[in-house]
């Protein structure tokens, strides 16, 4: 792009690092990673440079999402091949499940594998869903949504822990049913549904 010729040294370093990260990892770097790569300690200074790059039409940002910094030269490639989906680790008390402090990593998932909506990935811990074919260590692709229909497999938050169960709403309580004959259902008055399981990834 012609606008790249008008960049200062620091902005060019930042743009090159964003492109390199997208190419090598399949997802953009965080603001903190950009600062570390180019020697800037202040996140606000990095943000200022990102605003300038966006004004020059060299990147596209979504301030509501972490790591949503896409170099426009690479945007068609990223959109047509894969999307960067956050992998959720431990859920911090009181925070939305996609808050940056809950995100351990990102995985590139082919767009054809994802439907509509926002998604996250959760690594399965335990064997409560083995009879549904969901094993310990599997990675679940989860569509973010706040409710579910009876019988759907959901990720629910209980005491700030993410659990995977079948969802059933009864008259005055919610039943979270495991797919393991050795385990009992969990009943609660109400529950926060983080999303519906939409797919599964497994390493062999």
UniProtKB/Swiss-Prot annotation:
Q: Which residues cross the membrane?
A: none
Which GO molecular-function terms appear in the entry? DNA binding; serine-type endopeptidase activity
Top-rank taxon: Bacteria
Q: Which InterPro entries match?
A: ArsR-like_HTH, LexA, LexA-like, LexA/Signal_pep-like_sf, LexA_DNA-bd_dom, LexA_repressor, Peptidase_S24_LexA, Peptidase_S24_S26A/B/C
Mind telling me which CDD domains this protein's record contains?
Answer: HTH_ARSR, S24_LexA-like
Keyword annotations: Autocatalytic cleavage, DNA damage, DNA repair, DNA replication, DNA-binding, Hydrolase, Repressor, SOS response, Transcription, Transcription regulation
Q: Does the keyword Hydrolase apply?
A: yes
List the catalysed reactions.
Hydrolysis of Ala-|-Gly bond in repressor LexA
Q: Where is this site: Cleavage?
A: 93-94
Q: Name one GO biological process term.
A: DNA replication
Supply the EC number(s). 3.4.21.88
Specify one Pfam family. Answer: LexA_DNA_bind
> Which residues are catalytic?
128 (for autocatalytic cleavage activity), 165 (for autocatalytic cleavage activity)
- DNA-binding residues: 31-51
Instruction: Please report which protein family the annotation says this sequence is part of.
Output: Belongs to the peptidase S24 family.
User: What do we know about how this protein assembles, alone or with others?
Assistant: Homodimer.
State the protein's purpose. Represses a number of genes involved in the response to DNA damage (SOS response), including recA and lexA. In the presence of single-stranded DNA, RecA interacts with LexA causing an autocatalytic cleavage which disrupts the DNA-binding part of LexA, leading to derepression of the SOS regulon and eventually DNA repair.
NCBIfam families per UniProt = lexA (TIGR00498)
Name the chain's protein. LexA repressor
Species per Swiss-Prot/TrEMBL record:
Syntrophomonas wolfei subsp. wolfei (strain DSM 2245B / Goettingen)
> What is the gene name?
lexA
């Amino acid at each position: 792009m012609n606008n790249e010729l008008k960049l200062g040294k620091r902005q060019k370093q930042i743009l090159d690092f964003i492109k390199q990260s997208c190419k090598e990892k399949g997802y953009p770097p965080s603001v903190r990673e950009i600062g570390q790569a180019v020697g800037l300690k202040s996140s606000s200074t990095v943000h200022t440079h990102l605003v300038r790059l966006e004004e020059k039409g060299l990147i596209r940002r979504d301030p509501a999402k972490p790591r949503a910094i896409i170099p426009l030269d690479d945007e068609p490639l990223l959109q047509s091949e894969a999307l960067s989906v956050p992998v959720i680790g431990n859920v911090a008390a009181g925070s939305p499940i996609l808050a940056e402090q809950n995100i351990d990593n990102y995985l590139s998932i082919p767009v054809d594998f994802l439907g509509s909506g926002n998604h996250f990935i959760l690594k399965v811990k335990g064997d409560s869903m083995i009879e549904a074919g969901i094993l310990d260590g599997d990675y679940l692709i989860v569509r973010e949504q706040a409710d579910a229909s009876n019988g759907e497999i959901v990720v629910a938050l209980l005491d700030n822990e993410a659990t995977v169960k079948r969802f059933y709403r009864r008259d005055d309580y919610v039943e979270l049913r495991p797919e393991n004959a050795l385990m009992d259902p969990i009943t609660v008055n109400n529950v926060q549904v983080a999303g519906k399981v939409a797919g599964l990834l497994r390493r062999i």
